[in-house]
Amino acid sequence: MAHGAEMHMGKWPAPEVESAGYHEQAQLMQQAGVDAIFVEMVWEWSSHGKLAVAAAASAGIPVAVCLAVFDKETCQQECPCLSDGTFVEEVARELASGGRFQNVEAIMIHHTKLPLTHACLRAIRRGGWTGPLGCYPDHGTFVMPCWVYDELQGEHFVGEVSQWVEESNCTLVGGCCGIGPETIKGLSCWCCKHNGKSVQ
């Protein structure tokens, strides 16, 4: 259930229409027997992201909320914000409070540049979220009409992941756009060793 990134600069429907659309999609997925709903690309919270997450949570199945953070300055200041100015810590606090978000089982940071991830994960924990925490960043830059990637050393990525785990008890890790199979292979080996399993 992707949350309208393509509508970033366009016109949004009336809130009740937008909410009804999210609820309809959530119910259709629930009726189809999905095990969980991942609400991705939540780069805005106050007007739209909150509606999408509440609708997903109303379906009565586990929900993962996947926040995308682009603001380098606020991350460097240890107070990361979404694009609407909402602090990541505030979002975590609201999700941790239960209520209409009681079926939210995990919060993730995704589609976010690697150097920004640590501040975001720490902010989620500061917000009082004690449940599962995940991170799957992207890598590269979109230059019309396609993505451009520079090399990402697998060892560097694994080093970042180990810090997520140690500092923030991050238990769900992976990669988004631009994190290729070789990097994921190295991550898989690290995860097996970390979890005490033999590497195949």
Language-model-detected regions and their locations in the chain:
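Domain-level signal for soluble alpha/beta catalytic cores
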Residues: 1-200
